[in-house]
């Protein structure tokens, strides 16, 4: 009976050691994913934020005299693109702050709520970036193909550079969305493992 009682603390200690090693690997993976996600969302924000094109187009004729107008396409003209820039910019700031927390603030854990708060915030950022990327992708498709039922004409045949740059901003945003989803999943798994190895979860 005494030998069984002595084996149990060793088993618990070895289990906690394995979990601590796994958590360290998870922290390293999350750190790398956050760096790449930050670069992706920052790239998407900058590329879309600088997206504009000016063209002089033929809008009509009077007799044989052509009438031309200079038009400018800017991301600010489309609310979906504005939201895209805000969403990716917010995700960039969030990832930058979380990088600082991961590197310098690991000891700051108020009553064990650090992982809970981070997991919730990760899910919120995933939702925000998903909304921004999907709304911008919808408007990009509308600009490329138009909508014959609603009588909305396409514009990408006139503003090619604007559409290409907008499409280029969507790519890193969707890459960041995938990375943020992975980060959120790892955060939840880490939180779950922490609960399993907490003193309250161990049986006497």
From Swiss-Prot:
Ranges of the Cytoplasmic topological domain: 1-28, 102-114, 190-204
Subcellular location, record wording: Cell membrane
Membrane-spanning ranges: 29-49, 81-101, 115-135, 169-189
Record membrane topology: Multi-pass membrane protein
Annotated Gene Ontology cellular component terms: plasma membrane
Highest taxon, organism lineage: Eukaryota
Residue ranges that the UniProt entry lists as topological domain Extracellular: 50-80, 136-168
Keyword Nucleotide-binding: no
This protein's UniProt keywords: Cell membrane, Membrane, Transmembrane, Transmembrane helix
The keyword Cell membrane belongs to this UniProt entry's keyword annotation: yes
Subunit record text: Homodimer and heterodimers.
Similarity remark: Belongs to the Casparian strip membrane proteins (CASP) family.
Protein name: CASP-like protein 1B2
Organism of derivation: Vitis vinifera (Grape)
